C-alpha cells in the first residue's frame, strides 16, 4: 500500500509558513504513495533535521542562487514558480530542496514517486487536487510510464487535463482546467528522461557532491539538533568519510553516536569517530565493504579492467542499477574508477588504496 506525502503550510504569527505533515485527504490520492514517505518515528526525526529555509541549507551555493532569483522573480510577478528538474546522485538533498521551495514560496506541496503512478488515474487524482501555486514533487521521474508522461505534457505546458471519453469512433477528448502548479522532478538519471518531458522543465539544475567543510557544518548542525556532543575534529572525521553526501553524513553521525553512548559515554571526538567508523568498515576515504569489493573484483579477477557492467554485477552480486547510481558516481568522483566504451577500469589510485601494485609498476619490478 502506498501513501502520498502531503504538506500544508499555514502561516505563523510572523507571517511565515509553517510545515506540517498530513495524509492526503482526497480519496483519489490515498493509494498513490511513495514507499519512502511512510510516516514513522525515524522519518519524523529526519523531518526535524531537514532545513526548511535557504538560510539553513548548507552547500549547493550556485543552485541556491539560481532558485532564489527564480523565486523572487515569480513572487514579484505574482506567478507560480517554473517547473524544475533536479538531478544528481542520491542523498544530495533533492527532496529537501523541493520542501524549501514550497516554504520560500509560501505554498503547500505533495510528494510522490514515479513508480507509484502506475495508472493514469493516479496522476489525474493528484493534478485535480492541486491548489494554485502548489508544488508537486515526483521522485525518480525518469521511471514515469509513457501514458503518465502524455498526461503531464498539457498539464505542465497549458495547465489543463485532457481526458478521453468513450472508445473507438465515438471517443472524444474533454479538457479540464487545472490550477497553476509547479512540478519538481528529481532523478539520478537525467539522460533517461524523454526529450518531450525534459524540454517542458523551465529550470534544469544539477546537485553536486559536497565538500568536506560543508559536510562538517552539516554534521555539527545535525548533532546540535540531536543534542549529541561532538567536537569540530570529530565532525570533520565523520564528514570526510561521508562520500560527499549529506544523507550518509547524518547516517554515520547516528552510528557514531550509538558507539559513543555505549562504549565511552562521552563527547564524539576524532579518535572516537575513527574507531566507530572502522568498526562499521567505513575507511578514511568513505569506502565501505561493497566499494572495496567492487574495486578488488576489477583488479584481482579482471586485471584492472575493462569490465562490462553486467559482468561486474554478476561478480559482485549487486544489480546493475545499484552499481550505476549508488557506487560508481563516488568512485569516479574520487578518481578510483573510470568508465570507457569497453567497460569499467580501476585507476592507479584504486590499486594503491587497496594495497595492490599498479600494472606499470609491476613491470618495472621485473
Curated annotation (Swiss-Prot):
Chain intervals for the UniProt region annotation (Small ATPAse domain (RuvB-S)): 211-281
The record's subcellular location field reads: Cytoplasm
Mind telling me what this protein is named? Holliday junction branch migration complex subunit RuvB
Q: How does it assemble?
A: Homohexamer. Forms an RuvA(8)-RuvB(12)-Holliday junction (HJ) complex. HJ DNA is sandwiched between 2 RuvA tetramers; dsDNA enters through RuvA and exits via RuvB. An RuvB hexamer assembles on each DNA strand where it exits the tetramer. Each RuvB hexamer is contacted by two RuvA subunits (via domain III) on 2 adjacent RuvB subunits; this complex drives branch migration. In the full resolvosome a probable DNA-RuvA(4)-RuvB(12)-RuvC(2) complex forms which resolves the HJ.
Q: Name one Pfam family in it.
A: AAA_lid_4
Is Cytoplasm one of the keywords UniProt gives this record?
A: yes
Q: Which reaction does it catalyse?
A: ATP + H2O = ADP + phosphate + H(+)
- Spell out the molecular function terms from Gene Ontology: ATP binding; ATP hydrolysis activity; four-way junction DNA binding; four-way junction helicase activity
According to its UniProt entry, the protein's GO biological process terms are: DNA recombination; DNA repair
Coiled-coil spans in chain: none
Top-rank taxon of the source lineage equals Bacteria
Keyword annotations for this protein?
Answer: ATP-binding, Cytoplasm, DNA damage, DNA recombination, DNA repair, DNA-binding, Hydrolase, Nucleotide-binding
Where is the sequence biased in composition, kind Basic and acidic residues?
A: 15-24
Cellular component, GO annotation = cytoplasm; Holliday junction resolvase complex
Protein residues bound to ATP: 49-50, 91, 94-96, 157-159, 200, 210, 247
Residues bound to Mg(2+)? 95
Q: Specify the enzyme's EC class, one word.
A: hydrolase
**Ranges where the record places region Head domain (RuvB-H):** 284-366
Q: What does the UniProt entry state concerning the protein's domains?
A: Has 3 domains, the large (RuvB-L) and small ATPase (RuvB-S) domains and the C-terminal head (RuvB-H) domain. The head domain binds DNA, while the ATPase domains jointly bind ATP, ADP or are empty depending on the state of the subunit in the translocation cycle. During a single DNA translocation step the structure of each domain remains the same, but their relative positions change.
Q: According to its UniProt entry, what is the function of this protein? A: The RuvA-RuvB-RuvC complex processes Holliday junction (HJ) DNA during genetic recombination and DNA repair, while the RuvA-RuvB complex plays an important role in the rescue of blocked DNA replication forks via replication fork reversal (RFR). RuvA specifically binds to HJ cruciform DNA, conferring on it an open structure. The RuvB hexamer acts as an ATP-dependent pump, pulling dsDNA into and through the RuvAB complex. RuvB forms 2 homohexamers on either side of HJ DNA bound by 1 or 2 RuvA tetramers; 4 subunits per hexamer contact DNA at a time.
What InterPro entries does the database record attribute to this sequence? AAA+_ATPase, AAA_lid_4, DNA_helicase_Holl-junc_RuvB, P-loop_NTPase, RuvB-like_N, RuvB_C, WH-like_DNA-bd_sf, WH_DNA-bd_sf
